[in-house]
Amino acid sequence: MQPLLSVNDLSIGFGKNPPIVERLNFTVHAGETLALVGESGSGKTLSCRSILRILPSTAQIRSGQILLNNRGNSLDLAKLSERQLRDVRGDRVTMIFQEPMSSLSPLHRIGDQVSEVLKLHRDCSQSIAKRQVLKEFEYVGFNDPERTYNAYPFELSGGMQQRAMIAMATVAKPELLIADEPTTALDMTTQAQVLGLLKKLQAESGMALILITHDLGVVANMADQVVVMNRGRVMESGASELVLGSPAHPYTKKLFKAVPVISDSIQPALRQDTADIILSLRDVSKTYAIRQGNALSPNYSIQAVNAVDLDVPRGKVVAIVGESGSGKSTCARIALGAESSDHPGQVFFKESPGTDAIEVQSLDPSRRADFQRKAQMVFQDPHSSLSPRMQIIDTLTEPLDIHNIGTLAERRDRAIELLEQVGLNPSMLRRYPHAFSGGQRQRLSIARALALRPQLLVCDEPTSALDVSVQAQVLDLLEDIRDRLQLSYLFISHDLAVVARIADEVAVMRRGRIVEQAPPEVLLANPKHPYTQALIAAHPKPDIHRPIDLDTVALGAGEPDTWPDAFRYTVGNAPPLKEIDTNHLVRTHA
């Protein structure tokens, strides 16, 4: 059978430089899923953008063919005019981009943006287009299609924005859908639901799917064929059973080795030593007042955090796990004193064993500055947390300058020491952030957090923006400096596999409350709460024989008033956290 799409000897370059993508070959048949796998910079996105000829202005297709089956004849997309391409883009071949918020116009309603596809390619009226769009919205899982049609992008969550992008890409019933990292920015349960939706759409429409991803777990759940890329070249390709089951190339093996996994084995939990607690949150809550845009509408409030109690033992890693909006980052900011807790919440910090704990919320400015030297934060996105206008030496010495620590020579020596601590060369001091890779920038963020010799690091999703192998390197670094410098971590994440590797204790949050808490070897092997079970079930494993359990995900990912009776609650009647076993707490009525 003739393939729907054939890419033959494709090479892409910028200007007169050597090619970025070199001699790429793959085919996709109708109804088939091909996964392009690789780390950032491997050329997978550039390759797929070339199919639709939406490359950057300085990039050129140097050689090769991109053949689309046109009723038995081959149409070379690389040679079509711009006018001819308009009949292909958005109609026969469509694309879902990685960041839905940057792909959707903030100035236009969702429904109008999706309707535009039908007006361009089906020449239909506004009323017919709206009817078809509402039907598509219902199909992709919107509970209220009419409301979604009239909404602006900022009014939708990340998962809902991605569903809107899927609706836009599929409303014209394309033959080929290209999905560029469609779940990278999403939480685990939302990711599982989006992957399930793509499989459903594909099964019912027969469209082909090219999936661009760096996640081998996603590949195992979706792909029929796999192409592994590195630095613009194909390292390995073949059926997913072969590539995932017995990878042959060293690079593919390296990717597999770096994948964090959740163990199935249950180990008995030991009673934690609670004598030396460096950080303690007691009855911490946070309510935000939301102003309505319409002056006639009443304001309302959102409780982001609700009565959280949490201890971080000295020298240990305590992780808070949950989806976006669960309250975990708000807890982190309150722990550092960047936000205040609602009354009567308190945050206690003990500088050393045997000393009295200080209450962070009530510190005066001078004592707060002293506390901030001892508790620092590593942020999620190293790109936005490092000033593009400052050389690295200035970035690393700025905290020392603010706190009037050391002479200029001593600060420079400290900057060199910090680079060496995080595995970077001191010769990089005069570079700017843009000269570093994502993993190197995160190392720089960690180095800056260490500048004041803190005792506590709050790490807010420090690996979520990184490729899997770079993620493993950053986790290695965090473990190394924890042991060498005797640090304590409050670690924020949505990825249970990452947490399983680094944490001594895990607290799972949902809608502002801790619903389950235990050491990772207990929590991940023997979860009791339906939400914890959903998070674990939603984690894609790089094993084609262990697909995502969408039923378990749907059960636990719902609202608290839809959970099983033992765990169900509404706003005012949440059950308490109960110790059901040694160091294993569950919020349950039972």
PLM regions with names:
Residues 151-156, 160, 432-436, 440:
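Conserved ABC ATPase signature
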Residues 234-238, 246, 514-518:
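ABC ATPase "signature
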